[in-house]
């Protein structure tokens, strides 16, 4: 058993972190928080607007600040953005304060799932497939570095993936409060 005060979902966009995360949060009685949505609420602008105004570096700073604030709390299921693991401080914080679930998805499945999504600034380009392959090559080792548990989501519905994770989490994770 690996005790941790929070569950943290990591993985590429389109892996199912938010959809599956909401289901797991309900199942385990945790508060679900999507880091990107928390940033939008705090800043008062959409993710594309934040990228346009502050660039990716500005967005990543908001992401790091938001993640740190969330991880200081307990009993959360935190769904991170796909690039959260790029920052070594984020990786350290995630491992220190969460049981980390890595959801993996193949690039072809990502392309299918994200085909109509216009809310992801990094994908608003013609070479989406090449970009997703490059992101996977860079980020996948970082997801593996922080993961306590991994699940391939390509061939699972959200309900099936949730059921798989509930069984595995019951065997591997015990919710704990942080030391006082």
Curated annotation (Swiss-Prot):
Which SUPFAM superfamilies does this UniProt record tie to the protein? P-loop containing nucleoside triphosphate hydrolases
In its UniProt record, which GO terms are filed under biological process?
amino acid biosynthetic process; aromatic amino acid family biosynthetic process; chorismate biosynthetic process
InterPro entries, alphabetically? P-loop_NTPase, Shikimate/glucono_kinase, Shikimate_kinase/TSH1, Shikimate_kinase_CS
On the tree of life, the source organism's domain of life is Bacteria
Keyword Transport belongs to the record = no
What keywords appear on the UniProt entry? Amino-acid biosynthesis, Aromatic amino acid biosynthesis, ATP-binding, Cytoplasm, Kinase, Magnesium, Metal-binding, Nucleotide-binding, Transferase
Q: In which pathway does it act?
A: Metabolic intermediate biosynthesis; chorismate biosynthesis; chorismate from D-erythrose 4-phosphate and phosphoenolpyruvate: step 5/7
A GO molecular function term, named singly, is:
shikimate kinase activity
GO cellular component terms, A-Z: cytosol
The residues that the entry says bind ATP are: 14-19, 120
- The residues listed in the UniProt record as binding substrate, with positions renumbered to this chain, are 36, 60, 82, 139
| UniProt key word Disulfide bond | no
Give the cofactor note.
Binds 1 Mg(2+) ion per subunit.
Q: Which cofactor does it need?
A: Mg(2+)
* UniProt: Mg(2+) binding residues: 18
As recorded in UniProt, its EC number(s) are 2.7.1.71
Catalytic activity, per the record?
shikimate + ATP = 3-phosphoshikimate + ADP + H(+)
Q: What the protein does?
A: Catalyzes the specific phosphorylation of the 3-hydroxyl group of shikimic acid using ATP as a cosubstrate.
User: Per the similarity annotation, which family is this?
Assistant: Belongs to the shikimate kinase family.
What HAMAP family does the database record attribute to this sequence?
A: Shikimate_kinase
The record's note on quaternary structure and interaction partners says: Monomer.
Name of this protein: Shikimate kinase
The record lists the organism as: Xanthomonas oryzae pv. oryzae (strain KACC10331 / KXO85)
């Amino acid at each position: 058993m690996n005790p941790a005060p929070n569950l943290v979902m990591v993985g590429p966009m389109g892996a199912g972190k938010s959809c599956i995360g909401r289901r797991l949060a309900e199942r385990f009685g945790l508060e679900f928080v999507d880091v990107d949505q928390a940033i939008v609420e705090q800043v008062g602008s959409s993710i594309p607007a934040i990228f346009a105004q502050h660039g990716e570096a500005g967005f990543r700073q908001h992401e790091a600040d938001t993640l740190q604030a969330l991880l200081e709390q307990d009993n959360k299921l935190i769904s991170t953005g796909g690039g959260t693991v790029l920052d070594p401080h984020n990786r350290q914080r995630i491992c220190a304060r969460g049981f980390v679930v890595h959801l993996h998805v193949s690039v072809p499945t990502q392309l299918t799932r994200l085909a109509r999504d216009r809310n992801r600034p990094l994908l608003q380009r013609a070479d989406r497939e090449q970009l997703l392959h490059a992101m996977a090559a860079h980020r996948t080792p970082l997801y593996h570095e922080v993961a306590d548990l991994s699940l391939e989501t390509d061939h699972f519905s959200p309900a099936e993936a949730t059921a798989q994770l509930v069984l595995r989490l019951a065997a591997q994770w015990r919710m704990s409060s942080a030391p006082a």
